[in-house]
Amino acid sequence: MNFGEAIERVKTRSYIARRANWDNDVFIFAQVPADINEETIPKMQSLPEVVKREITEAGITSLSYQNQICKFDNGDITYYTPTGNEIFANDWKTKSDDTLVEWEYL
């Protein structure tokens, strides 16, 4: 499957990976959109204390995580930006909630 087809699958909460060049524990997914309320912000482990203080002092009462494409790499999750080689590759595969056992090749 090409990158365009693969990224469309990410939008449906599937995840994608390359058949070649990547370890078995590397894949791309979209973070589920989330709204964080003001009671949760001070407890967030993903934000530095100085950022939490800035948010609170600015009077912001909620945070919204939207459209974040992430790369899972052997336990590490980082933001994903595709390379040119990845964009033009035709060896993408996908898994969805319905088929977690088998990779689907389109």
Locate predicted features.
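Extended non-catalytic interaction/regulatory regions in multidomain proteins
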Residues: 1-72
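Short, compact, well-ordered microdomains
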Residues: 62-106
